[in-house]
Amino acid sequence: IGIGTRIRKSPYYDSNLKYGVTGFTVYNKMYLPTGFSGPEKEYQSLINDVTFGDFAAERQIEINGPDALDFVRFIQPRNLDKCDIGSCKYIILTDMNGGIINDACLLRLDENKFWISPGDGDVILWLQGIAINSGMDITIHEPDVSPLQISGPKSGKLIQKLFDGKHDELGYYKAEQTSLDGIPMVIARTGWSGELSYELYLQDRKLGNDLFEKVYKAAQDFNGRVIAPNTIRTIEGGLLSYGSDFGREHNPYTIGFDRLVDVDQEIDFIGKEALKK
């Protein structure tokens, strides 16, 4: 793929080149690595040791304001009664007909602050369009956040080494504010690999290559490898990809996402009436 100025480079771009990236695709208008040492070697490291890579193309959407929770409940059909601060939830965004706009990981970082980590698409424009006429007191923007994903059975050991055990008790689909040698980030026990995973949501893109290098050096103690998103393992894990496996022509029920819909909750949401039928 040609490299140009119209597509955004991630904060880890130079590190990708340094460690042998073999190609890129475009995802959320950013360059996303497609390979390093080959799919088989990367797969074996993913299921046996520990891997990490550039997932900055998961461009975050931040929702702030007194009505942030109400807005998040309005744009998707999952019941968020138990979404406390520090919780992460897998969600789908639906249109007025119940069609799926995209899927995403939702992080609640504060009482009135959420991040939405979507699949490929223009989700931020959809949300900003809804917000204009919602009457809700919120702001929506893209923050300076760039995820780096760590995955594999030894990923917990790598996190323990990097953070001196500080996040050993971090629960599944939980997130915490943290830092690594002065590099600010949110750490979440989330991922898109089918293996034990963590995501480091870097909060200063100028420090991307510094973070990549620190993770690389620590990972060598666990036979770590730099990888790209591994399609083989996501298929095995039953993980669906928006745009490839499903799209707006599908509703949650047709692809087995019933658990992400609660039409009996009192809260109104986009597509509720359509999904009741």
Tell where the protein language model's regions lie, with residue ranges:
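Acidic, proline/glycine-enriched N-terminal capping motif
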Residues: 1-91, 99
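Internal amphipathic helical hairpin motif
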Residues: 66-100, 155-183
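Acidic active-site catalytic centers that drive phospho-/nucleotidyl reactions
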Residues: 54, 103, 199
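Conserved, structured C-terminal
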Residues: 1-34, 106-277
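Short amphipathic beta-strand starts and helix->beta connectors
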Residues: 39-48, 93-103, 132-135, 179-187
